[in-house]
Amino acid sequence: MLRTHLAGELRKEMAGETVTLTGWVARRRDHGGVIFIDLRDRSGVAQVVFRESEVAERAHDLRSEYCVKVTGVVEPRPEGSANANLASGEIEVNVSDLEVLNKSAALPFQIDDPSSSGEVGEETRLKYRYLDLRRERQHEALRLRSAANRAAREVLDSHDFTEIETPTLTRSTPEGARDFLVPARLKPGSWYALPQSPQLFKQLLMVAGMERYYQIARCYRDEDFRADRQPEFTQLDVEMSFVDQDDVIALAEEIVSALWKLIGYEIKTPIPRMTYADAMKYYGSDKPDLRFDIKIVECTEFFKDTTFRVFQNEYVGAVVMEGGASQPRRQFDAWQEWAKQRGAKGLAYITIAEDGTLGGPVAKNITDAEREGIAEHVGAKPGDAIFFAAGDVKSSRALLGAARGEIAKKLDLIKDGDWAFTWVVDAPLFEPAADATASGDVALGHSKWTAVHHAFTSPKPEYLDSFDENPGEALAYAYDIVCNGNEIGGGSIRIHDQDVQKRVFDVMGIGEEEAQEKFGFLLDAFQFGAPPHGGIAFGWDRIVSLLGGFDSIRDVIAFPKSGGGVDPLTDAPGTIPAEQRKETGVDFKPEKAAKAAQGEKAGKES
């Protein structure tokens, strides 16, 4: 090794020892001919000082991010000059020898200056990601990710799971998003697909008798670009044979508990569960944030005889903002704009004065009986504001769900270090295909119904006989785990019976021929004693970003894509030259090849 110690591990007890350090020049200061340098390596920073004239003279030429090797003696810092912000802050290294291992060009941005981190655009940070990663916060992210990998593996290994890699070049099998396709050079006109998940292969592993499988898997989805999505992402993928929902949930809770212990938080288990129906009814989301106690109150029945046309609708609901009546008029106007940005016409409201008098435009348009009873119905008191949404059930609840989150922010109800976990169970097995496409997903199949999770999710046992007769009523044997309003994992008990799988395909408008073409290898496997099985997949990027308190999943990925799906570092995706296009067969036209083959055959016959 070129060094004897790490910079961040030096302590005052080591005073008098001669050490050799390697790393980068984080800061350089010249105090009357004595040169001080903050030397950074993966462990942290140590102050090194150049007092001897010859070596100090050479140190004058050092600049930020020069890669250097120094040898010197560990000494206590002079009284009053200790730095409590550094683990090595009580010592310095008096350097006797300096070697410049490599110089650095002028930096595109300052690395160790905290004030510059917010000034550097993300595109620039990602273009020079190798410099951005030198920052301590980014080091923390990748070390935390490694620790999370290790913690999960320890739990799974203790339960006799086997880590197995599944293919990343496979055939295109629709799973709810578009595939990334890879041309097969040796078979022109044919394409591999990068997997959206290991779903089908892990089910085949259960048929193979592996019983307990896991993998930290790379997945790929060609989705429309969203602010906090990545075209390639990582999930912890788990599958088990001979289990029911409670078994998978118990294991998942053990994994999640181990992960949050990394940051010193003890999760109380069992984690509470709520049904999908209750999540939507009370929180307007299947990913409810339970760090604050604001619930949606249904008012449809309360306003069933109303003369107010806005409330003469399929659904009316409300949320209460404690103390919200004191907001100025411009703030209520801002609420209207906020709602319009979400596709609503506005956000109706009532204010309750300290004397109980109702104010706001809604109060003028409802009946005396409605005015007298509304506060009690929604649980509001003097000084509060009541916000309403009316219209179709889905969009109205979604608006109120967003409003409860906005209220929590305005009232500062969410504190640092708050964690709230829940399982959401009993989701619908199917949804209207139009709803799936409207939300940006790919609706698998050709009927008016498509799978909410995926086509291999089993109906709950009580719906096994009837799900194809009443698809809209059937519930899935599925479970999602939610943390602070983020879905961090989801899974289900799978279909293991070929006949049940065929019936699910029938509901989705996938005929026998198409099913065999796209999923035949799985359906064939089900003929050979497939065991009952189920599993779960955790969104690894999301979990690590939550654990570390990062704003974006891009912060916990070593080399992420930008929000537009572009890699500023390598400038991917890029074009390819004509020669490479020809070689890979990207432009292969089957009909043209067939015509040429026919002509060649005719020529030989003549």
Swiss-Prot record:
Record bears the keyword Protein biosynthesis: yes
Oligomer status and interactors: Homodimer.
UniProt: L-aspartate binding residues: E175, R221, H453, R494
Gene from which this protein is expressed: aspS
Residue pairs linked by disulfide bridges in the UniProt entry: none
GO biological process, one term: aspartyl-tRNA aminoacylation
Main location: cytoplasm
Matches recorded under Gene3D superfamilies: Bira Bifunctional Protein, Domain 2 (3.30.930.10), GAD-like domain (3.30.1360.30), Nucleic acid-binding proteins (2.40.50.140)
Annotated PROSITE patterns: AA_TRNA_LIGASE_II
Gene Ontology terms for molecular function: aspartate-tRNA ligase activity; aspartate-tRNA(Asn) ligase activity; ATP binding; nucleic acid binding
Family to which this protein belongs: Belongs to the class-II aminoacyl-tRNA synthetase family. Type 1 subfamily.
SUPFAM superfamilies: Class II aaRS and biotin synthetases (SSF55681), GAD domain-like (SSF55261), Nucleic acid-binding proteins (SSF50249)
Residues that, per the record, bind ATP: R221, D222, E223, Q230, E487, G539, W540, D541, R542
Disordered: annotated span: 564-606
CDD domains in the cross-refs: AspRS_core (cd00777), EcAspRS_like_N (cd04317)
GO cellular component: cytoplasm
Task of the protein: Aspartyl-tRNA synthetase with relaxed tRNA specificity since it is able to aspartylate not only its cognate tRNA(Asp) but also tRNA(Asn). Reaction proceeds in two steps: L-aspartate is first activated by ATP to form Asp-AMP and then transferred to the acceptor end of tRNA(Asp/Asn).
Superkingdom classification of source: Bacteria
Protein name: Aspartate--tRNA(Asp/Asn) ligase
EC number: 6.1.1.23
